[in-house]
């Protein structure tokens, strides 16, 4: 069974609108539909302590943690801010997401 359909896709640029990383922008690295979450580059950084294994020494690794999809909005480069999207159908029948304010297409 597939998860829910989310309003963001992989490689979209998004703006965090709530939480400790509010107003940060980043690229979507991974979509997790079953958790309603996404991984955003440089947002919600957590520290992971790793134990020494064999010849490797223990260390503290910083990595992105999941953020809920409701806490982000798609970033429109033409409007230069976070925007809502609308779905438009092109002449060839293909559906694309567009900015509500300016009409800029996000799906090329």
UniProtKB/Swiss-Prot annotation:
Keyword terms of this UniProt record: Ribonucleoprotein, Ribosomal protein, RNA-binding, rRNA-binding
Domain of life: Bacteria
Position of the signal peptide: none
CDD domains in the cross-refs: KOW_RPL26
InterPro entries: KOW, Rib_uL2_dom2, Ribosomal_uL24, Ribosomal_uL24_KOW, Translation_prot_SH3-like_sf
Subunit structure and binding partners: Part of the 50S ribosomal subunit.
Function of the protein: One of two assembly initiator proteins, it binds directly to the 5'-end of the 23S rRNA, where it nucleates assembly of the 50S subunit.
Family that this chain belongs to: Belongs to the universal ribosomal protein uL24 family.
Protein name: Large ribosomal subunit protein uL24
Organism per entry: Geotalea daltonii (strain DSM 22248 / JCM 15807 / FRC-32)
């Amino acid at each position: 069974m597939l998860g829910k359909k989310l309003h963001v896709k992989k490689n979209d640029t998004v703006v965090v609108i709530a939480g400790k990383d509010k107003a940060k922008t980043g690229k979507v690295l991974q979509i997790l539909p079953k958790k309603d979450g996404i991984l955003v580059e440089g947002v919600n950084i957590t520290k992971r302590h790793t134990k020494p294994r064999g010849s490797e020494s223990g260390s503290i690794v910083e990595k992105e943690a999941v953020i809920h999809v409701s806490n982000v909005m798609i970033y429109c480069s033409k409007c230069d801010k976070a925007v809502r999207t609308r779905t438009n159908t092109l002449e060839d029948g293909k559906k694309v997401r567009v900015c509500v304010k300016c009409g800029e297409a996000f799906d090329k």
